[in-house]
Amino acid sequence: MRLLNGKIADKLDPVTDEEWAEVNEFNRNMVEDYLSNQTHLSPHSLHAYRSALKIFFVWVKNNLNNKNCIEIRKKEFLRYMNFLANRGLSEAAIKFKKSSVSALNKFIENFYDEDYPTFRNYVTAEMQVPKTGKVFAKEPLTPDEMDHLCSVLAEREEWQKLAYVKFTYSTGCRHAESLQLLKEVVNYEPKRKIVTIVDEDSKEQEVESVSYKTHEIRCKGRSAVGQVRKLQFGQDVMDALKKWLEVRGDDDCPYMFVVKTKDGSKVRQIGYSAFNDWCINEFSEIVGRRTTPHNFRRSRATNLVCYDHRALETAQKLLGHESSETTQMYVIREDTEDADEAFV
């Protein structure tokens, strides 16, 4: 990652508890009050907003003498956005951090109008996000690239990472959904069904579909409940999951994807950041271009429609979209609710 002046940028690390404790109490309390009232947000969204606001107020502590949030001015917030740009953040990342602060300000305007009647949101619509030129192309991985990635991970005996890649790609799920997978799924029975597909020569043929369904998983949606679904995956995924658990051995953690202490004495559910690190630091190196957890979802939809010649509606069912128009945006050229044609 490079700065606008050409130097290598430091990564914006998460704010530690010690750093957050140094932020003035007024700002910390306002952030907590705001977040506690956002009942429409999912746990993942709340985590993202909390992280963005903590980064901002640590910057305020370091650069604006730890002043109260209601005293911050527009020109000072512009300095913050320039700081983010100079740290090498993408325009999308800066835009989210801008919207997080703006949402907090709107909360203060609406809920504390009697306490602070002169306060106005200093993050305005006309305030442009700095043009960093750092906009990542949404290029799905081809079937050959997916095969290469899986082959290399198998050669390296990275069984957990291989299981993650196969599960995430096969289901087309988001990284917050992969996180919830329980290891009990390896004991589930397969669903077998004869389906009719259209091959690359536009001829119909009947083939057997073999797939599995997970336990209930909370997917993207408003509120803490969100949209609850059972994700569907193929036999190759089941084989990879079983291989990972065989290597992992017995432990008390119910989750499929985990982190262990060096001595292996403690095992716990893995965090979001690990999936990002795997993709950016290792999978990107294997594939030869930038890869993210969400790119597996986009790649699955594209390859299903463009390479496997399945109907757009099949990809729609697999990804859990309410409208095929949403699925179409993923496809880059980009039970009746099941996507059985995806598993033949």
Locations of the language-model features?
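Active-site/catalytic core of tyrosine-dependent DNA strand-transfer enzymes
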Residues: 234-288
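Short, basic (Lys/Arg/His-rich) helix/loop patches that form interaction surfaces
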Residues: 251-252, 276-317, 332
